Amino acid sequence: MKPITILSLGVTLVLSMTSCNKFLDENPYSSLVDPDNASKIEKLLGSAYSTSSIAYLTELSSDNIQDDGVNNPYTNQFCEKAAYWETIVNSDGLYDAPYLIWQNTYNSIAHANEALEDIEALGGDKEELQGIKGEALLARAYGHFCLANLFCLPYDPSSSSTDPGIPYIKKRVVNLQPNYPRGTMAETYEQIAADQI
């Protein structure tokens, strides 16, 4: 090979191995919505509602269900799979599972928290932001309420200070696998009530 070709390959190789440390040290978290006005925060808040069908599990424990026995084509799904917390596939081929309810509800809570932080960054006391802030707080409280009802013991005032609750997330999630402490049922319901005021 010609010396110029070898030299240019060597220079290219050396330059390609250098990098900018500042770029690599930054957290890769980014928001899909640039929240610079109330309208964009409202659009973000549309993601603060869970896409999982909590009804698969909650209706079985209510009095809103009628037993049609073997004549019901969904008896197998609702009675057997939901009772054992297995994946349920509906008639459209879509599926839902308890772990997806947990994951999707916390994802919705993360969107509500992101909206709340963006509202504060814009000056949360503005009149146009108050309704959006109230909706975000209510969405966060509702998500935690659903999770507490599905994944915790029933609320009992006599043991709520010792019964384990759920992690109550109040900040934007920036870590890939965050580890949040699990409070008691009393703490969980106090925070749910505080978000509704």
Q: Where do the model's predicted regions map?
A:
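Membrane-proximal, proline-rich intrinsically disordered regions
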Residues: 20-65
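Short, surface-exposed recognition loops and adjoining beta-strand edges that mediate ligand/DNA contacts
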Residues: 31-35, 62-72, 153-162
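Secretory-pathway/luminal and periplasmic proteins that interact with or process carbohydrate-rich
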Residues: 53-58, 143-155
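N-terminal capping/interface segment
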Residues: 55-82
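Conserved, well-structured interaction surfaces
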Residues: 80-151, 179, 183-186, 197
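Short coil/linker segments at helix-helix boundaries
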Residues: 150-190
